[in-house]
């Protein structure tokens, strides 16, 4: 199996997916370990000289003015972890935990945190051998980083807390023993270095952003299939329209629609059936394109964060300086994930309105609720209800978490990011949006079948065929949630996008 090599500087989102979801192991480059060792020497010298340095020879937060003697440094770090492990709620998914372990190791590999090399090796061994700490999903303010959830990670490094190993839940001590990993006794600065960072919010958000890059393509596919089902007008997607307002996402979406419906006999030109379409069809490039640009903005920000040093204080061995700063503050990610959540929610908003156009006979000209025996059968009536419910929930979830700071640590930490809440909310919005788009794909596949002698576009035909392998045409009412779940799974696992991209290049 391929290994991912880390050095703190050039980890990619794709490599993170390999480690988090495909269980690739990691190695650390020798040069990075040299940097880690050199930085550690600075910490040990400062402890020996009893210099006053935050988190090394002082307490934390409001207690930063309390001096700690060198013979108390190990106890200080242990107390930090056991007191800060205050997470609540359901445990994070295993893929997120693996992402957290990877990102924390990569941040330490930059060589500005001051941990011992063997402490970093313990973290890497846990990831490679499958010791996955049980980390509650709630309890982080997002500044100073993800203190509470990361403390649960470090408990297991110390042989405490809880973990899963080979699919079984057990004590952290037992998991480390079974994996053959000696627990660490934290030394000066190490507890702080391990928990003072944004790796939980970033792991949640990075995995989501990878999925969103597929989701925006899927949204274009769904919109294209609905465009055909509505005998939509292709002129609105002409490149001349979009080059005079050259937002990249808008231009890419317009080109995607044109490519997806190429060869379709259902697509019309302006004036053939109607002069212009409703906004949810005609403005797909502007709506989807804006979300596409927001997603790509988030990709850029996350690529910076996964290679960032988010510790405090930071140690610069070449200058022999230890500087207290604020790189732990999650605001760059909090704003990014709030923005991302809004962008995803809009994909669901417009999709649900297209569903309404498909099931409403006054708008579609098709049988009501896409059933030939309306009255006796309800057809797709309640699928639109479900989509409307999910869209309404998204509107609540899209309220920004980052605007809701609350002071902590006796007002020493008087502005916090709520970035982890923003990431978790964005994931919930994504899951709702997947289900809404799944309904649209089902409804559009049903709708096109009411036309005689039609030909779908090259891309939409592949999407339709993929859907029909899992969800049959609805002749009479049946249990709909089964079909909805099957179609949503095709979205979740990216099957539709992967199949369509075999015949059409999607930007």
Swiss-Prot record:
Modification after translation, per record: Contains an active site 4-methylidene-imidazol-5-one (MIO), which is formed autocatalytically by cyclization and dehydration of residues Ser-Ser-Gly.
Catalysed reactions listed for this entry: L-histidine = trans-urocanate + NH4(+)
Keyword flag Ribonucleoprotein: no
Residues annotated with 2,3-didehydroalanine (Ser) modification: 144
Cross-link 5-imidazolinone (Ser-Gly) placement: 143-145
SUPFAM superfamilies: L-aspartase-like
Calcium found in the keyword field: no
GO molecular function: histidine ammonia-lyase activity
InterPro entries linked: Aromatic_Lyase, Fumarase/histidase_N, HutH, L-Aspartase-like, Phe/His_NH3-lyase_AS
Domain of life (superkingdom): Bacteria
UniProt xrefs under PROSITE patterns: PAL_HISTIDASE
Compartments where located: Cytoplasm
EC number: 4.3.1.3
Family: Belongs to the PAL/histidase family.
NCBIfam families: hutH (TIGR01225), PRK09367.1 (NF006871)
Annotated protein name in UniProt: Histidine ammonia-lyase
Upper taxonomic lineage: Bacteria, Bacillati, Bacillota, Clostridia, Peptostreptococcales
């Amino acid at each position: 199996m391929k290994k991912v090599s880390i050095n703190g500087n050039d980890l990619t989102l794709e490599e993170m997916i390999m480690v988090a979801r495909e269980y690739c192991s990691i190695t650390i480059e020798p040069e990075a370990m040299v940097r880690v060792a050199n930085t550690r020497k600075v910490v040990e010298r400062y402890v020996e000289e009893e210099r006053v340095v935050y988190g090394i020879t002082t307490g934390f937060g409001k207690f930063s003015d309390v001096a700690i003697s060198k013979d108390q440094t190990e106890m200080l770090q242990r107390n930090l972890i056991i007191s800060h492990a205050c997470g609540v709620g359901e445990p994070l998914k295993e893929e997120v935990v693996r992402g957290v372990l990877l990102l924390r190791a990569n941040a330490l590999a930059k060589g500005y945190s001051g941990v011992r090399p063997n402490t970093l090796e313990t973290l890497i061994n846990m990831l490679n051998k499958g010791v996955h700490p049980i980390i509650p999903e709630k309890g982080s303010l997002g500044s100073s980083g993800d203190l509470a959830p990361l403390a649960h990670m470090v408990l297991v490094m110390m042989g405490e807390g809880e973990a899963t190993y080979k699919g079984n839940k057990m004590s952290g001590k037992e998991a480390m023993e079974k994996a053959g990993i000696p627990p660490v006794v934290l030394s000066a600065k190490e507890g702080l270095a391990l928990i003072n960072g944004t790796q939980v919010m970033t792991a949640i958000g990075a995995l989501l952003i990878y999925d969103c890059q597929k989701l925006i393509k899927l949204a274009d596919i769904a919109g294209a299939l609905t465009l055909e089902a509505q005998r939509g007008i292709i002129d609105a997607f002409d490149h001349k329209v979009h080059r005079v307002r050259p937002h990249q996402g808008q231009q890419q979406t317009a080109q995607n629609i044109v490519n997806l419906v190429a060869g379709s006999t259902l697509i019309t030109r302006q004036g053939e059936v109607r002069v212009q379409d409703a906004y949810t069809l005609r403005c797909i490039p502007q709506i989807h394109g804006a979300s596409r640009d927001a997603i790509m903005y988030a990709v850029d920000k996350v690529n910076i964060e996964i290679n960032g040093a988010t510790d405090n204080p930071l140690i610069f061995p070449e200058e022999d300086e230890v500087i207290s700063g604020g790189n732990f503050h999650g605001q760059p990610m909090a704003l990014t994930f709030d923005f991302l959540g809004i962008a995803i929610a809009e994909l669901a908003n417009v999709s649900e309105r297209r569903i309404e156009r498909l099931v409403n006979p006054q708008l579609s000209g098709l049988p009501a609720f896409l059933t030939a025996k309306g009255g006796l059968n309800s057809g797709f009536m309640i699928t639109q209800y479900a989509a409307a419910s999910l869209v309404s929930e998204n509107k609540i979830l899209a309220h920004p978490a980052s605007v809701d700071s609350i002071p902590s640590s006796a007002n020493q930490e008087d502005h916090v990011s709520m970035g982890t809440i923003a990431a978790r909310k964005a994931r919930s919005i994504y899951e709702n949006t997947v289900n809404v788009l799944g309904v649209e794909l089902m409804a559009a596949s049903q709708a096109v079948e009411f036309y005689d002698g039609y030909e779908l576009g090259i891309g939409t035909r592949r999407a339709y065929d993929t859907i029909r392998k899992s969800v049959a045409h609805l002749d009479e009412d049946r249990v709909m949630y089964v079909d909805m779940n099957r179609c949503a799974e095709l979205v979740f696992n990216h099957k539709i996008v992967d199949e369509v991209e075999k015949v059409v290049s999607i930007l």
